[in-house]
């Protein structure tokens, strides 16, 4: 009997040791083998895949900018504080009179139960993204042109995780996480006097993992909205991804909406090349294929484009985690124009034509890189 009990004890100990070693191996962070520069450009390195059971987690502590300090600017440029005291400013929109609108928002309330929910809640809190959303758009005004806003007012309140803004004629459009709203715009107002009209509902069901809704107006007045996927690679079922991982087209005059381009995991920033009808976007690609995959990117978007998500990435590389493979779609996958490095998380973009930044910066695009949470070493955190 003792021999049997001893055998069972040894067997259990071995199982625990094997399980512990396996868990350790599976959860070890994947250290990048290539630099962000090598993973960027028109022909970035396509590293070998490392399918992760647990993501590499590397979330920097948020400290903010101390008084008197600012980001380091490139030679010939300078940075100064325009306004402060904002609550998670997400996007900005400059009105024709020079006033600056700022969307202040966080993720809408989410279910934080279960292991996944608790882990995500902890990560967001560490990154400074916890708490209740301000759900407002503030107006900043620099009347004397000294580069500092003297006026800061709550322009629109009571929104639902607002993100994108666009002005067409005398109508200001605001993209909430769940709907596109239209407000009557009156130049010079410091508080919106008009009431909103809902134009269309936007995808926001499920976990609403990528909740931001970027927005840009085309030269003809139509609107384009970037909607991120509700998952990493469609693991919760593609029925939850209807009109997600897409750029949507909205025609406000008759409240018509359709999918303009698809297979784009999270098209956060949208902008038109100045003087043209050519639409561009910056995209956050998928996770858990290692620290070197997949490069986020900058690319143009035309009607009917398909960028491969979730089955493919970067023009046709297969993601083996997605089943069944959609081989019939592979021939239609468009390759992005420019890689921005893996996990750099590009959020905002603007073209520099017409800006007073000097000749060196007069013909290009500025892209704000939020920075990684799942890469070792960290990447991004720059413009």
Label each region the model flagged.
Residues 2-34:
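N-terminal type II signal-anchor transmembrane helix
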Residues 25-73, 111-112, 127, 132, ...:
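Beta-propeller domain segments
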Residues 62-87, 147-152:
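A short helix->beta-strand "capping" segment at the edge of beta-propeller domains
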Residues 82-85, 153-159, 199-207, 259-263, ...:
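Surface loop/turn motifs at the tips and blade-to-blade linkers of beta-strand repeat domains
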Residues 95-98, 167-169, 217-220, 273-276, ...:
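Residue-level detector of Asp-centered blade-edge/turn motifs that repeat once per structural unit
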Residues 101-103, 174-175, 224-226, 280-283, ...:
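Residue position within the beta-strands of beta-propeller blades
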Residues 140-145, 183-191, 301-307:
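Short loop/turn segments immediately following beta-strands, especially the blade-tip
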Residues 148-171, 176-218, 229-232:
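Asp-box/WD-like beta-propeller blade repeats and closely related beta-sheet repeat scaffolds
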């Amino acid at each position: 009997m003792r021999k049997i009990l001893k055998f069972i004890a040894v067997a259990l100990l071995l199982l625990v040791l094997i399980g512990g070693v396996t868990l350790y191996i599976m959860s070890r962070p994947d250290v990048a083998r290539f630099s962000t520069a090598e993973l960027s450009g028109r022909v970035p390195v396509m590293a070998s895949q490392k399918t992760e059971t647990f993501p590499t987690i590397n979330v920097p502590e948020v400290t903010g900018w101390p008084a008197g300090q600012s980001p380091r600017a490139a030679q010939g440029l300078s940075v100064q504080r325009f306004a402060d005291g904002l609550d998670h400013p997400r996007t900005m929109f400059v009105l024709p009179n020079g006033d600056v609108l700022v969307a202040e928002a966080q993720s809408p309330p989410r279910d934080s139960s279960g292991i996944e929910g608790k882990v995500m809640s902890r990560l967001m809190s560490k990154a400074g993204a916890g708490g209740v959303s301000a759900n407002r758009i503030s107006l900043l005004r620099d009347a004397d042109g000294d580069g500092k806003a003297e006026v800061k007012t709550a322009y629109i309140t009571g929104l639902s995780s607002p993100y994108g803004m666009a002005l067409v004629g005398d109508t200001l459009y605001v993209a909430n996480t769940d709907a596109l709203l239209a407000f009557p715009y009156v130049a010079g107002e410091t508080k919106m006097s008009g009431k909103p009209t809902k134009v269309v509902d936007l995808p926001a069901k499920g976990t609403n993992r990528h909740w931001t809704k970027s927005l840009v107006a085309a030269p003809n007045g139509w609107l384009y909205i970037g909607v991120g996927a509700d998952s990493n690679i469609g693991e919760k079922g593609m029925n939850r991804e209807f009109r997600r991982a897409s750029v949507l087209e909205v025609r406000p005059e008759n409240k018509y909406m359709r999918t303009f381009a698809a297979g784009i995991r999270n098209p956060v920033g949208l902008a038109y090349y100045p003087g043209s009808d050519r639409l561009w976007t910056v995209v956050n690609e998928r996770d858990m294929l290692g620290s070197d995959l997949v490069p986020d990117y900058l690319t143009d978007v035309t009607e009917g484009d398909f960028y491969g998500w979730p089955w493919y990435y970067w023009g046709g590389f297969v993601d083996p985690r997605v089943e069944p493979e959609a081989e019939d779609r592979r021939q239609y996958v468009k390759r992005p124009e420019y890689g921005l490095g893996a996990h750099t998380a590009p959020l905002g973009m603007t073209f520099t034509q017409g800006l007073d930044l000097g000749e060196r910066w007069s013909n290009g695009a500025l892209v704000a890189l939020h920075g990684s949470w799942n890469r070792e070493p960290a990447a991004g955190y720059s413009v």
